[in-house]
Amino acid sequence: LAGPRPIKDYCLGIFDGPHATPKESHDGPVFLGIKNITEDGRLDLSEVRHVSEEEYPRWTRRVIPQPGDVVFTYEATLHRYAIIPEGFRGCLGRRVALVRPNPVRVDKRYLLYFFLSRSWRHMVESSVITGATVDRIPLEKFPSFPAALPQVDIQRRIADILSAYDDLIENNKRRMVLLEEAARQLY
C-alpha cells in the first residue's frame, strides 16, 4: 500500500454538471439526479427525468458520462456513489459529479468500494461545508482529498472478491422477493 496521494492522481478528470435544471422532457437522454444514485453503490434508473435531444449538447458541455465513470452526489444527500454502466446515455444532474478513473492506476470497481468505505466517508465528512440549507462537499478541494490505494493488480483482485459477494447478495435479494411473492399467493 502506497502512502496517500491526491485522488486526482488516480483519475483522468473530475467533473460536475450544470448548476441548473433543464426543461421537462418526456423522452431523450437521462438527466441523472441524486435520487438515481443509491446508498449501496448502484444506479437506480427505474424513475428518471429526461433532457430533450435539442438540449442534450448544452447539458453535456462539461462532460459526457462514459461507462466506468464513478458518479457521486456532492450536495444535499451525500455519500452516494455508482458506476456508469455500458449503454448509458445521459448527463449529470444538479448536485451530481463524476470521477473518470485512470484504468492504469485504479480499478473502477475498487474505486467505488473505496468511496463507499467508512474511512473515505470520515475523510469527506471532515471537509463538508455546512450551509444554511444543505451540506456540500467542496468540489474545488475534492481532487486533493487523500487516497492510499494499493497497486492496480491488487485492487482488481479485491474488487473481484467484493463483486462476487455483491452478486450473491443481489441474487439472494431477488430470491427473497420471489419467495415472498410465492408465500403471498399461497396464503
Report each predicted region and the residues it spans.
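Non-catalytic DNA-recognition/assembly elements of restriction-modification systems
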Residues: L1-P18, S144-Y187
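A generic structural signal for short beta-strands and their flanking turns/coil linkers
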Residues: G28, E47, G93-R95
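A short beta-sheet element
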Residues: G33-I34, E53-L116, W120
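Flexible, active-site-proximal loop/turn residues at the rims of small-molecule/cofactor binding pockets
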Residues: T38, T77, Q151
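A short glycine-rich beta-alpha junction/loop motif
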Residues: G90-A97, R109, I129-A159
